[in-house]
């Protein structure tokens, strides 16, 4: 009986340690996806609007650690709409990013609601060539189930006692404003302008919001350098390469990826494209 109680206490204490690491130590790493290129606004708000057509809606979902009682779930949805401004080839993209994350025994939840705007200045009348300046900012809410938090203060010397106070003073939820800014350049390449390249630089969390349930830890700013190259192999087939270098002290991450894409049906009337790709990276 005593041995079982000790094991139970150890497990609860281990959960608390993991929770504290999530709240305080791993603050330097933002949420991100292996297929990072499917969440462009998380890379750089100035990458909004870099697509064919007027509207783009993207969704990404990640589910980790399914073997545990409370798996880690992360989802992202971004929507963009672009329209011309002025008399030239300039245009504006407006939209937003919604990011949701849920993790751990204490059901730690994070919700980002981030509207964005991106202005694209045309640099040429002979080809597609734009310099873009984007801004994204909104609110982030973080919360947890306070009743699930357990600490060593609830160990009475023999076993875990949930009726004892946990000795912690933090609240179960808080919100903060988060802001990002970025620039990008994109242009067509080749004798027939059949290829496409872009690169950009973004500065995230430049307002350094407080990012802790204790209200005493500033969110570390993050730099992201991005690049991409689209090569058309023929009228219906193309390859796209993406790369990011992320620096958020003390972490640095380099990710690269690519997709092979093929339009289905008639090359001029097709609205369906099949993609296959991979994403290696290093931290």
Predicted feature descriptions by range:
Residues 1-38, 258:
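Bacterial Sec-dependent N-terminal signal peptides
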Residues 29-283:
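Subset of outer-membrane beta-barrel
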């Amino acid at each position: 009986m005593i041995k079982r109680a000790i094991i139970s206490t150890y497990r609860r204490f281990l959960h608390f340690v993991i929770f504290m690491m999530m709240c305080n130590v791993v603050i330097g790493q933002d949420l991100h996806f292996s297929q990072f290129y499917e969440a462009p606004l998380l890379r750089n708000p100035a990458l909004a609007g870099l697509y064919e057509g007027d509207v783009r809606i993207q969704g990404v979902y990640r589910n980790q650690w399914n073997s545990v009682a409370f798996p880690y779930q992360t989802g992202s949805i971004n929507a963009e709409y672009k329209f011309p401004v002025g008399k030239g080839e300039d245009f504006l993209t407006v939209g937003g990013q919604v990011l949701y994350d849920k993790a751990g025994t204490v059901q730690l939840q994070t919700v980002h609601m981030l509207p964005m705007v991106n202005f694209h200045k045309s640099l040429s009348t002979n080809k597609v060539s734009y310099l873009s300046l984007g801004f994204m900012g909104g609110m982030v809410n973080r919360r947890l189930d306070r009743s699930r938090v357990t600490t060593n203060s609830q160990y009475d010397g023999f076993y875990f006692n949930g009726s004892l106070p946990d000795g912690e003073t933090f609240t179960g939820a808080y919100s903060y404003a988060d802001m990002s800014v970025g620039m990008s350049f994109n242009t067509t390449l080749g004798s027939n302008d059949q290829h496409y390249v872009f690169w950009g630089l973004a500065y995230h969390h430049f307002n350094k919001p407080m990012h802790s349930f204790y209200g005493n830890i500033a969110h570390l700013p993050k730099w992201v350098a991005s690049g991409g190259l689209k090569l058309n192999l023929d009228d219906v087939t193309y390859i796209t390469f993406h790369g990011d270098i992320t620096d958020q002290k003390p972490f640095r991450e380099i990710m690269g990826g690519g997709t092979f894409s093929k339009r289905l049906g008639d090359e001029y009337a097709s609205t369906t494209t099949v993609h296959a790709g991979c994403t290696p990276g290093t931290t």
